[in-house]
Amino acid sequence: MTSGNVMLKHQDVTIERIEKFLSDTYFVRENLYGKLISLKSSEAVKVKVSPKVEGISYKDAIQLEYKDTKIGESFGPSWTNYWFKVTIDVPTDWKDKTIHFIWNSSCEGLIWMNGIAIQGLIGGTWQDLREEYKLIENSKGGEHFEFYIEISCNGMFGVGKDGLINPCDPDRTFELTKAEIRVKNKEANELYMYLQMLYDVGKNFPKESLRKKQAIWVANDIINQCNVNDSRTFSKCIELAKKEFFSQHNSESQTRVWAVGHCHIDLCWLWSFEKTKEKCARSFSTQILYMDYYPQFKFTQSQAQAYQWTKENYPELYERIKEKVVTGQFIPTGGTWVEMDGNLPSGESFIRQFLYGQRFFEKEFGKKCTEFFLPDTFGYSAQLPQVIRHMGIENFITQKLSWNNLNKFPHSTFIWEGIDGSSVLTHFPPADTYNSQADVKEIVMSSSNNKDIDRCNESMLLYGNGDGGGGPTIPMIERLTILKDTAGIPKIEFSTPAQFFKQLEPHRSKLNKWVGELYFELHRGTYTSQATTKRGNRLCEIELHATEMLTSYCELFVEGFKSPNLSKLWQQVLLCQFHDALPGSSIQVCYEDILKIHQQVLVECKNIITQSMNHITGTLLKIDNLPTTSTTTSTTTTSTTECTKNSEFVLAFNANDFEISRVIEIPKSNKDIQAQYINAIQTSYNGLPLGTVSLPPNGFSAINISTSGDNRTINRKPGYPCTAIEKNDASGDILIDNQFISIVIGSNGRIKSLIEKSANREVIKQDGSLGNRLIIFDDTCLFWDAWDQEIFSLEKPLSILEGTCKIIENGPLRCVVQVHYDSKGLPSGNGSVNQTIIVHFNSARVDFETNVNWNEAHKLLRVDFDTNIRAKNANYEIQFGHIERPTHYNTSWDFARFEVVGHKWADLSEYDFGMALLNDCKYGYSTLGGRIGLSLLRSPKSPDDTCDMGSHKFTYSIYPHRGSLQSASVIKEGYSLNNNFYISETPFSLASTTHIDKTFISTNKEAIIVDTIKKAEDGTSFVVRVYESFGGATTFNFTSSILPIPFKSIIECNGLEEVNQSSKSYKFNDTIKINPFEIKTFRFISN
C-alpha cells in the first residue's frame, strides 16, 4: 500500500490516478472501466427496418414491410421516423444472467412491446445518453424476444447544423451504431459507482477538507487492492469503500436535500410541437419503468398540455401514469396548462394557464397542484404572486435567475411579494439547475450555495435530464440512494414538491422578503424576437376577450342562444405562450405552427363575433321588445321606439371598459354601409369614408349612418377640427394642430416639437433632440442569439432613418402625414419602412402606423423620443397593473434593466405632466433620463435564421398629458389603442330618433377595470373579473344600463371560480372594497 505521506503530498496526482482508473478513454485494457461488461453479442440480435413514415400507430407499424439492416447504416433525413423490428435469441449458455439490450441509433427512440410503450432511448454520446434496456433477469438461456423500436431522426436537442442552437439542418442522417445484448459485471459496475463518487468528493471538496482527504485515501487504497483481472477483488473493494467512507453518517445538524426527480420537456424549442408528443412518451414510459425498479423513486411532471397529448396519442401509457399517480410515485405539479413565459402573456392569460391547468389535474388525477412550478422562463412579472394566490396556490419553484450575468440574486428561499402585497413562499434550488445529474458536486452545492442556510437549511434538488426530455437515469437514482446519509454530504430524501414545502413552512417567519418583479438579467431580446408571434398573441388575447363578453351577453338576452365553449381556443393560445414559443427562441417550424394556430383562433373568434352581432341585431329589430334603458347612468338615454323607420343604423360593440369616441374608416367589405353613408365629411387617403362613433363601456350602440347632425350619428362635424399645414420655408416642416396638441413634424419624419396645450408644455427637448428617431443598431450578443439583446449593442447605432413627408389627409376629423424612409438607411439596402402619422381631432394621442419590410441580419430597429421630462422613475404596464422602474444607472441592478418589459404602455412623468409611449404589439422598453424608447424588430439568425424576415405592421403612439398617468387616463389610452370595436356587416332600419346605448357590466370608478366577462366553466353562472388599476385602495359598485338588472346575486370567488363558506355575497348595487392592484373575481348569478 502506498504510504499516506506520499499520497497527501501529491493530492492532485492521486486524483488524476483515480480518474484514469475510471476512464473510458485511457488505459481501458488495464482499468476498471474495461471490466464493466462480462459478455456481449451482436450476433444474437437481428434488426429489420421499415420505410420512413410519419406519425403512425403501433398497430399500423407492425403491418409494415421490413427489410434487413445492419450496424453502420444511416437513416434520415431530419425529423423523419422509422420503425425497427428487433428479434433476439439469447445464447443458451447465458444462464442465470441479467441481460441488457443495447441500442444506439444516434437519435431518439422508443421501445414497444406488445403494443405498449416501454422505454425511451437516446442515442449519441453526451450525458443524456440512454442506450440500455434491462431485457430479463435470471435468464434461463435460449429465450426468444421480438419487439419494435420507433426512432425519430433528431438528437435530444434537435438537428442544429454544426451547433446546438444553430438553424436546423434538414438533411441530417443518423447512424445505427449499436444493437446488441450484454451481461454486465455486477460487482465491477457497483465498484465503479463507489469509486466515481469518491473521485467526485476528492475533486470537488475544498482542499483542506477532511472528507476530501479521506475520499482520496480510500479510493487510492481501493485501486491498490483491486486486481481488474480477478473479479473476486471487486467485492472486497466495495466493502472497503463502504466501511472506510460511506458507513460514516451525518449528525442531526446536517443540512437536508430533498431530491425531486424531474423531466423538463420544452413543448417546443429546437423541435416542433409534434416531436414533443413523442418526447413525452419516451420520457414518461422510462420513468414509469424506473418506478417499478426503485420503489423509493418519485418523479414529478408539470404541464397539463403534456399530459393531454399523452392521453390523446398514447392512451395505454396514460393509464399507467394515472396508476402511478395513485401510488404516489408520479407527481403532477405546477398547476398550469404549460410552463409559460413569465413576462409577455396578459393577466387574463396568466389566469387561464392556472384555470385550465388546475381543472385538468383535478379532473384527471383527483387533486389540484399545491405549487407553481416554472423552472425555466426569462423573468417573472411582479403580478405573479397575486395571480398564484388567486388561483389557490401558495408555493413557487424556479431557478432561472441563477443565470443572471450581472448581479447574483441574494436568496434561495424567501417570501416573494407582488405589487398588491400578496406573497408566495419561493425556492430557488441552490444547485442552480433544473437538470441536475445528482452527482456529488451538485448535491453538495445544494447546501454550500444555499444563500439562506442560516434561516432554513432545507433545499431542493431537481434532478434528471431535461429540456429535450429524458428525466432521471438509473445511475442518478442509485447515487442518491447510496449517498442518502453519508457524512460530509447533505442528508438526502426522495421527495415531492409538496413534501419539500411542508418542511419549509416552519421557517417562513425567519425568511427574507423580495418585493416586486424577479427581473432576469439575460435574454432581454425575447421581449422583441419573432414579432409576428407576439402580435398574433396580443390579437388572440384581445379577440377572445371580446368574444367571451359578446357571447355572454347573447346568452342572457338572445332567446335560444348558448355560449360556445371557448376553452379549446384558449388552450391553443396558452400553448403558444410556452416559454420558448412566445419569447421567440425556437426554430422556424415552431413559428409556422404558431402562425397557423393564431390565424385559426382569430378566424373562429371573428365568426363567433359576427354571429353574436347578428343575433343582437335581430333582437333589436323586434321594436316592441327593445329592452328599457336606464336614465340613471351617464352613458345612456331613454330609448325611443317610433315606428317610422326612416334611417339606417349599424350595431357597434365596444369591448373596452370605458366610453370611447373614435374616428373610424368604413371598410370596403361593408358595401351596404358605404351605400348608405354617402355624405362623409372626410374621406381617407385610400378612399374610405370616415365617421365618428361614441360607444358606451362594455356595450353597444345603434349608430345612425344616414343622417348628419348630433352626436348620435356617425357623420358629425367636430367643434374644433384637426388641421395640417406645410410651412412656407426651407425646413419643409409640417404643423398639425387640434384642440389638445400642436405638433411639428420635420421633413425627415422626426418630431421637432410637441406642445400639450392644457399645460402649455413642450414635450420634446429643445436642444436639437428629436422624437420618432428610428434607429438601427448592431445587434450581436455573447451566445444566445434570439434570446439576448446586450447593452453594448446600444453603443453602436448604425443609422438613423431619413424620411420624406407629405400630408395625405387634412381634417377635419383627422390629419395624416405619410413618411417614406429611404432604404439606403437600411444596412442591407433591401427593404422598406413607411409610416402614417395620425392625429385625430378629439385626442392628444399621436399614432405612428408603421409598415416594415425587414431583411436585415443581426440588426435592431428601435424608436426613441428625447423628451423634456425629468423623472427619476418611469411606469410600465404589466399584467393587471403597472410597476415603477428607475430611469438612471446608479447601481448595477439599475444598469442591468437597460431593457425592460412593458405591455401596452410606458409612462414618463414628472409632477403634473408626462408622456406615455404606447404600442399595439411590442414589449421591449428602455428609459434613460428623459429618453424613452421601444424596440421594434430584431434579426437574430439562430435558432431560426428567418426570424422577423419579411413584412410587419404595427403601431406605436405617444400621448402627452397634464396630470399623472392615472388622472390623464393613460391606462385607457393603452386599451383604446389595442382593443377593437366591432360593427355589424349589414345596416338595418329604425326610426331616425332611436337612441340605443347598452352597457352590459361596468363599474362606477375609472380605476376599476372590468377585464373579463365570461360564462363560468361549470356553465351555471357568469364570471366577471376586475382589477384596481391606479394603485390605490377604493370602493366601487357594478353598473349596467340594462333594466331590470339580470342578476339576482354576486358571489366573490377565486380565480378557479370556486366559492367556499367564506366567500362574500353581494347584491348588484352593493359597494365593494378593493385594494391597490387587487384582482377580484365574481360569479354573477342570473335571474
UniProtKB/Swiss-Prot annotation:
Q: What lineage is this protein's organism placed in?
A: Eukaryota, Amoebozoa, Evosea, Eumycetozoa, Dictyostelia
Cofactor(s) named in the record:
Zn(2+)
Q: Which GO terms describe its biological process?
A: mannose metabolic process; oligosaccharide catabolic process
User: What positions constitute the catalytic site?
Assistant: 376 (nucleophile)
A GO molecular function assigned to this protein is: metal ion binding
Give the catalytic activity. Hydrolysis of terminal, non-reducing alpha-D-mannose residues in alpha-D-mannosides
Q: Which organism is it from?
A: Dictyostelium discoideum (Social amoeba)
What's the name of the protein? Alpha-mannosidase G
Instruction: Give the record's keywords alphabetically.
Output: Glycosidase, Hydrolase, Metal-binding, Zinc
Q: PANTHER family given for it?
A: ALPHA-MANNOSIDASE 2C1
Q: Where does Zn(2+) bind?
A: 264, 266, 376, 579
Would the keyword Hydrolase turn up in this protein's UniProt record?
A: yes
Q: Which family does it belong to?
A: Belongs to the glycosyl hydrolase 38 family.
